[in-house]
Amino acid sequence: MGHRKLASPRRGSAGLRPRKRSSELLPTPRTWPQINSPNPKLLGFVGYKVGMSHVFMIDDWPNSPTNGKEIYMPVTVLEVPPIIPLALRAYAVDGKGEPNVITEYWSPSSLQFLDITRRIHSLSSFLKNDESKKKFEEKFGSKLDLIKSNLDRIVYFRLLVATQPRKIPSLGKKVPDLVEIQIGGGEKKAQLDYALNVLGKEISIKDVFKEGQLIDVVGVTKGKGFAGVIKRYSVVELPRWHKHRKGSRKIGTRGPSLGTPSYTPQPGQLGFHRRTEYNKRIIKIGDDPKEINPAGGFVRYGIVRNTYILLEGSILGSKKRPIFLREAVRPSYVFENAPKITYVNLLSKQG
C-alpha cells in the first residue's frame, strides 16, 4: 500500500497564519499592559536596529547555576534618538462597545517639527504665514475642549509620536516614522496634563525605560521572498530516486481532490511577517557611542551617533529597520537593578 502507516505532527503553526507580508514596516502593538504607577508615562518607544555584539556580565538571575559569576551574553544594539509627540488621541467606547477615536488634538508647538510635513503634506498649508498658524490653533482648540468635556467617557489616551531619522546618518532618510503610543499610569486627568505638557517636546528613552527591566519587541522579520515547503514549513524531504522520480523537496499529497485543506503545507511568502517577541531584557542604556562602536563600525550600518540600548539576545528584523519597544505585558521576572557589565566587545566586525 502507498499510504503511510505512522502518524506525524502537523507542520507549521496555525497561530502564525496568514503567512503574508506585513502591511506596515513599523506596526503598532495591539495590546498594552496595565501598570501600577502614580505618575503617567509612555508605554513604548521606537528604535532602529544596528546589529549584534557580545558582552561579559555578572549573572544576576535568581536560582541560576551561574548566579554571581561572569557569563558571556550576546546582545543586540539599537540606536534610539529622542521621539517627539505631535498629537493627542482620545479613545472612548462607541455604540458597538469597542474603543474608538473620538477626537484628535494637535498642539501648535508640533508644527515646529518641520520634518512632519514630509510625512503629512497637508500640514504644510498651516506654515505659510501667521494667519494660517492662527487657523491651525482655532481648528484644534475646540478639539481640546471636547476632550476635557468628555473626560469621564474616555477609556485611554494615546500620543501620535514621530521619530527623528535625520539624526541617524546611517539610515539615509529624513521622513519620520509615525506610531501611536499609549499613556499608562495615574488618573485620566493626570494623563491629560502629562500629554499636554510633552506635546512638541523631545522624549528620551530614559524617560520611558530603565536598565535591567524586561520589554517586548514588536516589528517585521527579515523578508525571504517566495519559498518552498522545505524551508517554509520544515517538511521532511522525501527519499530520492529509488522511491520516486517526481521530486523530493515537496509534500507527498495535498489531500483529497475536493480541495486542499488550509493546514496543508504549500509554498509561498516567507519572512517580512509582523511578529512580537516577549521579555527581552535591557542590559544597558548609554549616551556615549564610543562605549559600543567597534573598530570600523557595524557592518551594513556604520557607527552609532545617538543614545543606544543593548538588549539581551537577538531580535527580529534586519539592520536599519524600525523596532517598537513596549512595556512587558507578562514579565517573567522583575529585576531591581541593572546587570553589572565587565567587558564590551569593540573588536572589528569585518573579519
Swiss-Prot record:
PROSITE patterns named among the record's database cross-references: RIBOSOMAL_L3 (PS00474)
Biological process annotations from GO: translation
Complexes and interactors: Part of the 50S ribosomal subunit. Forms a cluster with proteins L14 and L24e.
Species lineage: Archaea, Thermoproteota, Thermoprotei, Sulfolobales, Sulfolobaceae
Gene: rpl3
Assigned keywords, A-Z: Ribonucleoprotein, Ribosomal protein, RNA-binding, rRNA-binding
Keyword Ribosomal protein: yes
UniProt-recorded Gene Ontology molecular function terms: rRNA binding; structural constituent of ribosome
Family, similarity comment: Belongs to the universal ribosomal protein uL3 family.
SUPFAM superfamilies for the chain: Translation proteins (SSF50447)
Annotated spans, Disordered: 1-31, 246-271
Functional description taken from the UniProt entry: One of the primary rRNA binding proteins, it binds directly near the 3'-end of the 23S rRNA, where it nucleates assembly of the 50S subunit.
UniProt cross-references to Pfam families, sorted A to Z: Ribosomal_L3
GO cellular component: cytosolic large ribosomal subunit
Disulfide bond as UniProt keyword: no
Descriptive protein name: Large ribosomal subunit protein uL3
